UniProtKB/Swiss-Prot annotation:
Record protein name field: Small ribosomal subunit protein uS15
Known role: One of the primary rRNA binding proteins, it binds directly to 16S rRNA where it helps nucleate assembly of the platform of the 30S subunit by binding and bridging several RNA helices of the 16S rRNA.
HAMAP family per record: Ribosomal_uS15_B (MF_01343_B)
Bias kind Polar residues: ranges: 10-22
Record-level GO BP terms: translation
PROSITE patterns assigned: RIBOSOMAL_S15 (PS00362)
Keyword rRNA-binding set for record: yes
GO CC aspect terms: cytosolic small ribosomal subunit
Keywords from the UniProt entry: Ribonucleoprotein, Ribosomal protein, RNA-binding, rRNA-binding
Length: 89
């Protein structure tokens, strides 16, 4: 379920704020979104994998907390991330 190194570096390059940025909320949300999408595909095939379902719920909660933080600090960056990732809210 982990992201490939190339996928991860590509996502970081797309959402980083400066050259050495790897931990900004935008980057973290983008990485979590990709992991969530992979888990959703896994669960479509393996319907009864409840351990992975719990992990998915934890990732969604972590992403929600990061988005709440970003929304409270900078609403414009929040909207940009939501629109670029195609998330509802």
């Amino acid at each position: 379920m982990a992201l490939e190194k190339e996928e991860k570096s590509q996502i970081i390059n797309n959402y980083q704020l400066h050259e050495t940025d790897t931990g900004s909320p935008e980057v973290q949300v983008a990485l979590l979104t990709e992991r969530i999408n992979q888990l959703i595909e896994h669960l479509r095939v393996h319907i009864h994998d409840h351990h992975s379902r719990r992990g998915l719920l934890k990732l969604v909660g972590r992403r929600r907390r990061l988005l709440n933080y970003l929304q409270s600090k900078d609403r414009e960056r929040y909207r940009k991330v939501i629109n670029s990732l195609g998330l509802r809210r």
